[in-house]
Structure formats: structure tokens, C-alpha cells
Amino acid sequence: MKPAWLVLRDGRTFRGKALGAVGEASGEVIFHTAMQGYQEILTDPSYRGQIVAMTYPMIGNYGVNDEDVESRRPWVNGFIVKEASPVASNFRSGASLDAYLARHGIVGIQDIDTRALTRHLRDRGAQDGIISSLAADPAPLLERARALPGLVGRDLVAEVTAAAPYTWAEGGWELSRGYVATPPARFKVVAYDCGIKYNILRQLRTIGCDVTVVPASTTTAQVLEAKPDGVFISNGPGDPEGVPYLIESVRGLLGRVPTFGICLGHQILGLAAGGRTYKLPFGHHGANHPVKDVATGKVEITAQNHGFAVDPASVSAHGWEPTHLNLNDGTCEGLRHREWPVFSVQYHPEASPGPHDANYLFHRFADLMSQKGG
């Protein structure tokens, strides 16, 4: 195996071995605490601009397959593991993790102390870095890492959104039955693609939505022209303030159409409501984050992937209230308007990977559309 380096902008350096494609990759280095679901993570467009380090010590045990992807290709800038399993022990596997990364040009590194890296990022915060399996000397990489642009203010959504509208018809997938039939469509939904995951679209179809996916640049007028029963605003990468055109479009829809936002969509709704967002020290990236429903007191274990959060106090004067709180750090995990049929969550109720505790939120969206006559 070729040697490889990981160099962070604060000078911390790790020597390891090459994984996947040979080359260099740069981006914001973050850690993810899920034990499985690496294929879904790799193909989640929300990771555009980031190098993902998995905290679980062995990754790749079950290989990769065609069904578990969350988009048309991997989107991570780079991938870090302690050990990549050379054996894929799974009858569904079509390739090893290493081969999959190499085929898609994803540069990775393995055989580094991911515990030390995780503690460093926890204490110092997520930061830009470079993986290189080309450099013999890591010293020149440090200056380049310090010159990286970071995520704040950048429009990464434009890099992952759909080029044109399309209709989604595929239902869920089950091990025993494969792709399952979907119910007749009851609602017409326009889904803003900020980096939307396939399993979100499957969940929308499962509750009876005829889903039209539109680019993030779609205007308010274009959405209203479609006469939807509901609007969905998806997950996506980076800083929500980097997409002012989408914020403006969503602002024009508030109170006019039942609306549901997830992850970046939650942040976009917060900004459209006149609120503010801020960057978290190292973000929430994992499949076991406890979230409390303020109204019921019930605790949900949730899948999360975000580096920014909404300040709930900044929207409270505009008719909004927090609905969910993160029990680890107290950050806002959900919002709803007191009068309009609009709500959002910061986490991922569709899971993939992760628990299904919050799947009921899709049915809540269907209920709002039903009440509006959908």
C-alpha cells in the first residue's frame, strides 16, 4: 500500500496508508460516529465539501451494493478510516469499499489513529485539511490546507442540485421483496433538491405523494404555478446563508402552501422566517443523537448530519417556536409556525442510515396537506 498523509490546517499531521483512489483531496474534516451505513454516508450529497472520518474502527465489512446508495454517485471529498476491511462478508456485496472508492475517484486514508483525530476535532473544532497519497513530504500540504476556503458563505448546493425538474416514482426497498409497490398518489408535492437523498423521496412516495423534484434555483412563482398540495425542502451541504436565492423563494411560499423542511431545509426555513443560523464547533454527524419533543416529552434517537444550527430566539418574534431540542447540547432540532402549516426538523427522519424513530414526521406532513384539501 502506498503511504498517505492527512494534514490539518492547525498543523496536526497523521501518516497512514492510501485508500481508494491515489491522489489528493481537500475539504473540511469532520467525524461521523455511526457504526454502519458508510455507503449511504458516501453517497449523501450533504457531505459535499467535506472529508469524513469514521470513528468506528473497522469499515467496509459488508462491501457495497447497488441498492443502498442515496444519490447517483459518492459526494464526499475524502474518506478516513482506521481499517478498511479487505473482505466483504455479505451476499449482497458487489465490490469492496476500497474498489468502490477507487472506481469513483474518492481519495481516502486508512491506518491512522482515528480516536486521536476525533478527540482533536472535538477539542479544536472541525477544520480544513488535505489527504495526499502523492506527497512524500507533508510540509508543503500545510500551507495549502491553510489556504482552503472553508464552508462558510459558499454555495455548495449549486454543485449537487438537479439540473432540471424530474418526477420520482420509486418506492421503498425491503430485503425480502426488493422494491415495493407505492400507494396511489393523493398529494402533489414539489421537492426542492438541495442535495436530496433517495430515501427521502421514497418516504414521500410511501405516504402517497406524486413528487416533482426541482432545482434549488426554482422560484416562488414556478412552484406556485405547479399548484402543489405541499412543498418539501431537502437536506444539503454547507452553509445555508450561501443560498440566498433559495431563502428568498421559500420566503415567498410561507403561509401559502404546507411546507416541510429537513436538515438544510430546516435552516433555510429559519432564515426565510427572518432568523439567523450559526456554525457549530464540530457539527452533529451520527446515528444516535437523542432529541426531545418539546410538546410530548418523548425522546427520539435520531440520525444527524449538519454543521450549522438555527437560533430559535431569532425567529420567536415572527410566530415560530421550537418543537425539538438536542439533549446533548441543547441546540434547536425542530421548528413550527404557530398559525401556518409549516414545520421542520434539523435531523433525518428518513434515516438511511440510522433509526426510524422519527418516521412519523412524514405522516404529519401528509396530515397537513389533507387539512388543506390535498
Q: What is the meaning of each model-derived region?
A:
Residues 334-371:
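A glycine-centered loop/beta-turn motif at secondary-structure junctions
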Residues 188-192, 302-303, 343-347:
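Active-site-proximal beta-strand elements of phosphoester/diester hydrolases
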Residues 107, 188, 258-260, 276, ...:
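Proline-centered loop/turn at the N-terminus of a beta-strand
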Residues 1-221, 225-226, 240, 352-354, ...:
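RNA-binding accessory domains that recognize and position tRNA/RNA substrates
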Residues 113, 263, 306, 348:
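Active-site glycine-centered loops adjacent to acidic/histidine catalytic or metal-binding residues
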Residues 229-230, 234-301, 309, 354-369:
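Cysteine-nucleophile active-site neighborhood
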